[in-house]
Amino acid sequence: MAPNPRKSHPILKMVNNSLIDLPTPPNISAWWNFGSLLGICLVTQILTGLLLATHYTADTSLAFSSVAHTCRNVQYGWLIRNLHANGASLFFICIYLHIGRGLYYGSYLYKETWNTGVILLLSLMATAFVGYVLPWGQMSFWGATVITNLFSAFPYIGQTLVEWAWGGFSVDNPTLTRFFALHFLLPFLIAGLTLTHLTFLHETGSNNPLGLISNCDKIPFHPYFSPKDLLGFILMFLPLTALALFSPNLLGDPENFTPANPLVTPPHIKPEWYFLFAYAILRSIPNKLGGVLALAASVLILFLAPFLHKSKQRTMTFRPLSQLLFWILVTNLLILTWVGSQPVEQPFIIIGQLASLAYFIILLILFPIIGALENKMLNF
């Protein structure tokens, strides 16, 4: 009998072991769909991005008009741009839900998989930031100025670091050119990191909602979970196409329809919605260096998740107190996102400060305490 190429061919064998014959826990829920959705998001963003890059000019005098030209004169250029811009929002929705799932079900105990995932998040944030600068509208320019300026908070090397990032003494043509180069390069780095992420995941196998070892009871990924993933793709593309076709500018900033002008500062500089929670934490601290450190800590704190796990149970499925705390954390993040979009005035300042404090207290202090308390309750 001839060997099946799916199982013997060096490349097809890898695909087979990752997507077809992959042993999968039988009880994983829809929360396990987001990994594959993120993969589809990445492919979509790279394809639409490549098409946009063929019509884009990375020059301060031409960038804004080249984007307008793409939307007006290129066949379906408006659609490609709308899919790319709104695809980024969907990418972040999926990654935040994916991280939330990881925190809820204790997936962070697979340390290598979790750490590569956090590095992926940081790479995605960097890619989205440099990408937002490319249309060279008002918010692009001032967003780049404000965020890159944060590096100047570092003692001694700060100012040198900023000028090195800018390629001059302000955000100008060299900045735009290097940001375009980075925005083109980083998605391929993300694709490589994704393979590392998957390699580490397939070393241990997937976690499941009960947090139990399911090696004795696994089923092949295809045909049991492939249709489930397909349904996920359809349910993701529906809102994306609806957004791109009916309300493409809903999540954008009207300021970005004005070409960048270094002489006019917008009344309220703010990043895209998916960075608002971190921006609110940054703004909550009156000291510049303190704000930058809090901003970095708000994301880097995820690296500590495996060390803050004190419970004897892996998931929160049977831990009502931890569940309550988890949903308080989610609500807190939504409050931070809302505060980040508001002007810097009372009562938003104090709400932001309290929510920022609550964010770190919940993750660093309350989760370990509640975990230890639930261990005690198991003895009764």
Curated annotation (Swiss-Prot):
The chain crosses the membrane at residues 34-54, 78-99, 114-134, 179-199, 227-247, 289-309, 321-341, 348-368. Pfam families: Cytochrom_B_C, Cytochrome_B. It is found in: Mitochondrion inner membrane. SUPFAM superfamilies: a domain/subunit of cytochrome bc1 complex (Ubiquinol-cytochrome c reductase), Transmembrane di-heme cytochromes. Binds 2 heme b groups non-covalently. Component of the ubiquinol-cytochrome c reductase complex (complex III or cytochrome b-c1 complex) that is part of the mitochondrial respiratory chain. The b-c1 complex mediates electron transfer from ubiquinol to cytochrome c. Contributes to the generation of a proton gradient across the mitochondrial membrane that is then used for ATP synthesis. This is Cytochrome b. It comes from Todus todus (Jamaican tody).
